[in-house]
A protein has these predicted regions:
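Substrate-binding cleft of extracellular glycoside hydrolase catalytic domains
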Residues: 1-128
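Short His-Asn-centered micro-motif
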Residues: 9-10, 30, 135-137, 158
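Glycine-rich, charge-decorated loop segments at or immediately adjacent to ligand/cofactor-binding or catalytic sites
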Residues: 67-70, 142-148
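Functionally critical loop-and-helix segments that line ligand-binding/catalytic clefts
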Residues: 1-10, 15-18, 146-209
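Histidine- and/or cysteine-centered catalytic micro-motif in compact active-site loops
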Residues: 61, 95, 137-139, 160
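Hydrophobic anchor at the start of a short beta-strand
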Residues: 56, 130-132, 155
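Short, solvent-exposed loop/turn segments at secondary-structure junctions
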Residues: 99-101, 140-143
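Aromatic-lined carbohydrate-recognition surfaces of secreted/lumenal glycan-active proteins
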Residues: 128-142
């Protein structure tokens, strides 16, 4: 199987881009969280990745206590043109709340949380004309999403093991695999370790994501 290397980052990471591993071809950057947070490093990362011609993507961290519309408005307010070359589809990060004790806001009504995610996806897809990438992990689908699936959306799975990730119910394949949350790469200065990713395809297939 052919994999393309990538990373995903936020303001918690600082990168010496001049030393970035040349095998890394795509970078997803945290853009927003909830109804009001915008990652303070996003604009700097976004513009630099453009100058380097790397594939670049933006993601939103879904919070259980804010409305889908408010969260979508926060993400869309960045004004990203998803029709531009090398711009990857929006990604929604559906996982444990921060801190994880806030997962109680999911478990008290899992169907409401599923609807929240679905509504965000629908709003953002209508606005951007791109299929949203779904990020989560297999156990989260089972424990918090009642094994609900979005089978027409690209799937990004977190699975920190040497073999390919197991698929959640309702999925036939994965598009991106986050295989490490504590990896190191050439170009890291400080700010914790990097999330390391594989894209399931060839470089030109990123244009079809």
């Amino acid at each position: 199987m052919s994999y393309i290397k990538g990373i995903d980052i936020s303001h918690n990471n600082t990168v010496n881009w001049s030393k970035l591993d040349p095998e890394i071809k795509f970078v997803y950057c945290k853009a927003t969280q909830g109804h009001g947070f915008k990652d303070p490093a996003f604009n700097t990362y976004w513009q630099y990745l453009k100058t380097k011609g790397l594939y670049r993507g933006a993601y939103h961290f879904l919070t259980a206590t804010d409305s889908a519309q408010d969260q979508a408005n926060n993400f869309l307010s960045l004004g990203i043109d998803f029709s531009k070359p090398n711009v990857l589809p929006p990604m929604i990060d559906i996982e444990d709340q921060v801190p994880a004790s806030l997962n109680v806001n999911i478990t008290k009504d899992k169907n409401a949380f599923i609807k929240l995610a679905t509504d965000w996806i629908n709003i953002v897809e209508a606005a951007t004309k791109r299929k949203v990438v779904i990020y989560s992990y297999k156990n989260f689908f089972a424990e918090y999403l009642n094994n609900h699936s979005w089978p027409t959306n690209p799937l990004w799975l977190a699975s920190y093991q040497p073999k390919e990730p197991g698929l959640p119910v309702g999925y036939k394949d994965w598009s991106i695999w986050q295989y490490s949350q504590d990896g190191t790469i050439d170009g890291k200065i400080h700010g914790g370790e990097f999330d390391l990713d594989y894209f399931n395809g060839k470089l030109q297939d990123l244009d079809k994501l």
